[in-house]
């Protein structure tokens, strides 16, 4: 039995050593001649030790040539003008270009013009040219922690990271197939720190919110944080549709970008803030958008996400999870304090343009013809925000300080009763017959009428008789009634006409009917009834073309006036919202320093240069040759005609030697001091 084991031990050793017959045969002979079991085992071990290096050598011998014959790394060629040096890595190529070709100011060899290939970009600083060289060199040292994408410059990575703010579907979930074993089996793991772009301070998850139970498939653990851990079960955000008081992220982003562009136009003065038409056209682009300034949140840049749902199977359940918030990038046009102050001044000009222009206010349907619009805290409101129903903040055009019509004097306190409308404007507002001069016009009616009367009390024709109305004015009441549809719209009354039905039109000349008055003639003659005697609502016949045209025109005017008024209100409210947004940012100190803005401007300048380089544009700064320089070429080689000198006029104080009648001529061999004798 021991002999069989020895043979089995020797047999596998003899297989790989078949190539070397002289060495293997004596060893096998020695093993077969020994009869002791211990000696046999010792010989088998020695044979295996001797054969193992040979086997390893035979196995490694074909691998060594393969490694020696592998292709070398691809070399990178420097494409700088006049240089063709090859370098092994992008890092070495970048260092070569920066040190050899760009140089430094301290070594007196600084070159600020890129000569890579056909690029001739010129910068003003060495940092700019070194950052520009990264465009040509395939060096991408800056990697994104979220997706692993590499970038050449840090500003490119910074802009790329902002795009991950859109990833609001998956909150903190691992990728498929990369599940953490510590989360599966409840070990003391190190925690799954998934990369995220969320503000940790805005989403504190209390530690007592988790009710841990017996470990099941998903073991709740804590991330390695000093305090207040915010990682619990693996949970996903379920998109249950838009919430009632919250718009979607896409609409918020569109409004955010539109508002940033609007602030940029204000800074660059691309429209006149003193023009009502220009202001209205520019504000129209911001309407019907979900602007961050219209929300009641303290920080408009933050928008909450749907509440996450924990994925766990066990008798325990997670506590209430506050919804994390994603952070929109800051507005590039309102970063510094000076930007906020300047934009607030521009908005103030726009607000004054809308309020203080009489024509614009009258076109909006707020002012009446013949009245002057006064904007102050008495007739309007303390703030610039108009209420739902615009008050009549108008004063008379007389030179003295006339009283201001109160809002309650033009509207009935009850919305279910007809409102009082002013009488015809045929009466002069400056006369004593104006309803403004009545003491009843200045009384403020209480919100609820006291008494057992079911209907509101209306002023009679005798009210205020002793305070300005004469006996002749008793025939006409000082006020008329209007429907509830005319709540806030000012009626336009024509002067000197009565509001009555239009009389029926008749021919200019009518001949006398001389026919016999018999039965047949009576049947042939149609009976004409005056249209003014028939109620239009009870008129059975079809209206005439003039009536239809006039009615349609009046309806169109009312609709247009209503649209203009609503647009004016929207503009006023929007400007106030924008001013409140700027004021809140100034109060909270939400602005950056000027140094950060300068750095961002340099980065934007580098990005523009990179885009120009990719498009193949030649940005060499060349001084333009003017037409005058072209015309002056070759003038030095040509002889110019000498202009004759002006003969000076001899005065009384001049001597004969000073005055010369002829111009001075100089010879070739004279020094120019001698003069011709006169």
From Swiss-Prot:
Compartment(s) of residence:
Cytoplasm; Nucleus
Q: Where is this motif: Nuclear localization signal?
A: 158-164
- Stated consequence of mutating residue 455 to D: Abolishes interaction with palA. Severely reduces proteolytic processing of the full-length translation product by signaling protease, causing a stringent loss-of-function, acidity-mimicking phenotype
Q: Which domain of life is it from?
A: Eukaryota
Q: Where are the zinc fingers (C2H2-type)?
A: 76-101, 112-136, 142-164
Q: What SMART domains does the annotation carry?
A: ZnF_C2H2
- Pro-sequence residue ranges: 253-493, 494-678
Keywords noted in UniProt? Activator, Cytoplasm, DNA-binding, Metal-binding, Nucleus, Repeat, Repressor, Transcription, Transcription regulation, Zinc, Zinc-finger
Motif YPX[LI] motif 2: where in chain: 662-665
- In which residues does the motif YPX[LI] motif 1 occur? 455-458
Q: Which parts of the sequence are annotated with region: Signaling protease cleavage?
A: 493-500
Report the induction information.
By alkaline conditions.
**Does Zinc show up as a keyword for this record?**
yes
Start and end residues of each stretch annotated as Interacting region A: 169-301
Segments of this protein annotated with the region Interacting region B: 334-410
Instruction: Identify the stretch(es) annotated as Signaling protease box.
Output: 479-502
Entry's family note: Belongs to the pacC/RIM101 family.
PANTHER family given in the database record = PH-RESPONSE TRANSCRIPTION FACTOR PACC/RIM101, PH-RESPONSE TRANSCRIPTION FACTOR PACC_RIM101
Domains (record comment): Only zinc fingers 2 and 3 contact DNA. Zinc finger 1 interacts with zinc finger 2.
Name of the protein in its database record: pH-response transcription factor pacC/RIM101
Source organism of this protein record: Emericella nidulans (strain FGSC A4 / ATCC 38163 / CBS 112.46 / NRRL 194 / M139)
Tell me the organism's taxonomic lineage. Answer: Eukaryota, Fungi, Dikarya, Ascomycota, Pezizomycotina
């Amino acid at each position: 039995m021991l002999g069989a084991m020895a043979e089995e031990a020797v047999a596998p050793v003899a297989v790989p050593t078949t190539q070397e017959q002289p060495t293997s045969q004596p060893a096998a002979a020695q093993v077969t001649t020994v009869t002791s079991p211990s000696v046999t085992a010792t010989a088998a071990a020695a044979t295996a030790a001797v054969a193992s290096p040979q086997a390893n050598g035979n196995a490694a011998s074909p691998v060594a040539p393969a490694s020696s014959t592998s292709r070398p790394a691809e070399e990178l060629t420097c494409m700088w003008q006049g240089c063709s040096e090859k370098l092994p890595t992008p890092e070495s190529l970048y260092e070569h270009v920066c040190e050899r070709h760009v140089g430094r100011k301290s070594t007196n060899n600084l070159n600020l013009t890129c000569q890579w290939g056909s690029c001739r970009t010129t910068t003003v600083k060495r940092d700019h040219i070194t950052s520009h060289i990264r465009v040509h060199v395939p060096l991408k040292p800056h990697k994104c922690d979220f997706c692993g994408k590499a970038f050449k410059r840090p500003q490119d990575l910074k802009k790329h990271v902002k795009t991950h703010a859109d990833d609001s579907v998956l909150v903190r979930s691992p990728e498929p197939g990369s599940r953490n074993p510590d989360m599966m089996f409840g070990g003391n793991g190190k925690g799954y720190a998934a990369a995220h772009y969320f503000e940790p301070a805005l989403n504190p998850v209390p530690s007592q919110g988790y009710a841990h139970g017996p470990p099941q498939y998903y073991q709740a653990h804590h991330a390695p944080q000093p305090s207040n851990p915010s990682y619990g079960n693996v949970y996903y955000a379920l998109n249950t549709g838009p919430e009632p008081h919250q718009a979607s992220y896409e609409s918020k982003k569109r409004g955010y970008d539109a508002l940033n562009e609007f602030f940029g136009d204000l800074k660059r003065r691309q429209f006149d803030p003193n023009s009502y038409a220009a202001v209205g056209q520019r504000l129209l682009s911001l309407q019907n958008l979900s602007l961050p300034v219209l929300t009641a949140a303290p920080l408009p840049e933050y928008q909450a996400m749907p509440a996450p749902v924990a994925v766990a199977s066990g008798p325990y359940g997670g506590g209430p999870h506050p919804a994390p918030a994603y952070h929109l990038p800051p507005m590039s046009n309102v970063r510094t304090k000076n930007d906020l102050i300047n934009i607030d001044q521009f908005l103030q000009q726009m607000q004054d343009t809308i309020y203080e222009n009489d024509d614009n206010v009258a076109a909006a349907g707020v002012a009446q013809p013949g009245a002057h619009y006064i904007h102050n805290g008495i007739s309007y409101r303390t703030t610039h925000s108009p209420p739902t129903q615009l008050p009549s903040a108008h004063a008379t055009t007389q030179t003295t300080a006339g009283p201001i019509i109160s809002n309650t004097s033009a509207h009935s306190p009850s919305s279910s009763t007809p409102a009082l409308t002013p009488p015809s404007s045929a009466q002069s507002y400056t006369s004593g017959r104006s309803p403004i001069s009545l003491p009843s016009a200045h009384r403020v009616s209480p919100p609820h009428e006291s008494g057992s009367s079911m209907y509101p009390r209306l002023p009679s024709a005798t009210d205020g008789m002793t305070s300005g109305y004469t006996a002749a004015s008793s025939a006409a009441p000082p006020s008329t009634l209007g429907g509830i549809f005319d709540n806030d719209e000012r009626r336009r009354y024509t002067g000197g006409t009565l509001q009555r039905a239009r009389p029926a039109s008749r021919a200019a000349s009518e001949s006398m009917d001389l026919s016999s008055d018999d039965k047949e003639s009576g049947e042939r003659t149609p009976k004409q009834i005056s249209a003014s005697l028939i109620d239009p609502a009870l008129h059975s016949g079809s209206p005439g073309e003039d009536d239809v045209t006039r009615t349609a025109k009046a309806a169109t005017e009312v609709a247009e006036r209503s649209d203009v008024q609503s647009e004016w209100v929207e503009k006023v409210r929007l400007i106030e919202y924008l001013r409140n947004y700027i004021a809140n940012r100034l109060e909270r100190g939400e602005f950056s320093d000027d140094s950060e803005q300068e750095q961002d401007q340099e980065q934007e300048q580098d990005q523009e240069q990179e885009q120009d380089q990719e498009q193949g544009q030649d940005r060499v700064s060349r001084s333009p040759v003017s037409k005058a320089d072209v015309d002056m070429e070759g003038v030095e080689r040509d002889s110019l005609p000498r202009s004759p000198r002006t003969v000076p006029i001899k005065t009384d104080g001049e001597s004969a030697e000073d005055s010369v009648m002829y111009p001075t001529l100089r010879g070739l061999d004279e020094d120019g001091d001698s003069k011709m004798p006169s």
